[in-house]
UniProtKB/Swiss-Prot annotation:
Protein name, UniProt field: Small ribosomal subunit protein uS9
Taxonomic lineage from the root: Bacteria, Thermotogati, Deinococcota, Deinococci, Thermales
Keyword rRNA-binding: yes
Role, per record: Part of the top of the head of the 30S subunit. The C-terminal region penetrates the head emerging in the P-site where it contacts tRNA.
Organism of derivation: Thermus thermophilus (strain ATCC 27634 / DSM 579 / HB8)
Complex formation: Part of the 30S ribosomal subunit. Contacts proteins S7 and S10.
Pfam family, one: Ribosomal_S9
Keywords: Ribonucleoprotein, Ribosomal protein, RNA-binding, rRNA-binding, tRNA-binding
Example of a GO biological process term: translation
GO cellular component: cytosolic small ribosomal subunit
Length: 128
């Protein structure tokens, strides 16, 4: 059986996505998609690339994701799905690229600097 692979990263999260022709079953780390992301409204955003190319019920997705929090994992899955779809059909790139699904979000947490409380928060300044 043919399958298509895409890797997605976001913050500290890394998602490995395998798409196979099927009926729309999505499994994340061995659990059902809704079970893994239960109660998170944002989770549906991970499946947006499939909606964009009208392929929502046409593929089964087997996803392993590790690292980061749930939000970063959702965005990592989104990128992985988009890349796997382009592997399946290179013509999808024209639809997915303008919507930003093939762009890796490079924003990561800024490091804490010495002499500061956080990355930018400085100790309170007293004039006198």
């Amino acid at each position: 059986m043919e399958q298509y692979y895409g890797t997605g990263r976001r913050k500290e999260a890394v998602a490995r996505v395998f798409l196979r022709p099927g009926n729309g079953k999505v499994t994340v780390n061995g659990q059902d998609f809704n079970e893994y992301f239960q109660g998170l409204v944002r989770a549906v955003a991970a499946l947006e690339p499939l909606r964009a190319v009208d392929a929502l019920g046409h593929f089964d997705a087997y996803i392993t994701v590790r690292g980061g929090g749930k939000s970063g994992q959702i965005d990592a899955i989104k990128l992985g799905i988009a890349r796997a779809l382009v592997q399946y059909n290179p013509d999808y790139r024209a639809k997915l690229k303008p919507l930003g699904f093939l762009t890796r979000d490079a924003r990561v947490v800024e490091r804490k600097k010495y002499g500061k409380h956080k990355a930018r928060r400085a100790p309170q300044y007293s004039k006198r």
